[in-house]
Amino acid sequence: MKDPIETYMNLVPMVVEQTSRGERAYDIFSRLLKERIIFLNGPVHDGMSSLIVAQLLHLEAENPAKEISMYINSPGGVVTSGLSIYDTMQYIKPKVSTLVIGQAASMGSLLLTAGEAGMRFSLPNSRVMVHQPSGGYQGQATDIMIHAAETQKLKDRLNEIYVKHTGQTMKKVVDALERDNFMSPEEAKEFGLIDEIVENRSKDDAET
């Protein structure tokens, strides 16, 4: 028997839009995509990254000059999956603004700070967490050493990305990511992970 809570969480609301050709129904995420809003919600894994990357590429093809908004509520996840989203954000022509709602932890925080400079935001009660990558391996000793070396390479690369987008020194980034480091929006702004804390939608946004 399915968990009723899981079933409820898998239900996607539908919205109906009136057009000149009559009514048209969209799932809520497709409707947001029409407004160039991508909602990154939940753990980052290969399935999610393929969907996010596809949406980014679709919106670029639709209008390469128009901004894309990415709303993030994620506990993090698989590093390589997150890096595929990160690389696509940097690769495409449209500017990508980011906004954390709820939490941006681990890989979620990296995607948050990867937004266009000056366009990285947080709602006032969101939380941001940074840390170093983790992994558990078993098998032959040589294989464990190979995986440990790869994890170290990923750690070094992630540190470089945080340095690039926060403006902090490598030492400060390494120290900050040594353990789970939870930040308020104010602390995240001071560290350079975000640019502004927003409580209300701006007048210009409300009119668009």
Curated annotation (Swiss-Prot):
Q: What is its main location?
A: cytoplasm
Which reaction does this chain catalyze? Hydrolysis of proteins to small peptides in the presence of ATP and magnesium. alpha-casein is the usual test substrate. In the absence of ATP, only oligopeptides shorter than five residues are hydrolyzed (such as succinyl-Leu-Tyr-|-NHMec, and Leu-Tyr-Leu-|-Tyr-Trp, in which cleavage of the -Tyr-|-Leu- and -Tyr-|-Trp bonds also occurs)
Q: Does the keyword Hydrolase apply?
A: yes
Q: What keywords appear on the UniProt entry? A: Cytoplasm, Hydrolase, Protease, Serine protease
Q: Where is the signal peptide?
A: none
Annotated GO biological processes are: protein quality control for misfolded or incompletely synthesized proteins
Q: Where is the active site?
A: 106, 131
Enzyme Commission number(s) of this protein: 3.4.21.92
- InterPro entries registered for this protein in UniProt: ClpP, ClpP/crotonase-like_dom_sf, ClpP/TepA, ClpP_His_AS, ClpP_Ser_AS
Mention one GO molecular function.
ATPase binding
What Pfam family is a match, any one? CLP_protease
Q: What does this protein do?
A: Cleaves peptides in various proteins in a process that requires ATP hydrolysis. Has a chymotrypsin-like activity. Plays a major role in the degradation of misfolded proteins.
Name of protein: ATP-dependent Clp protease proteolytic subunit
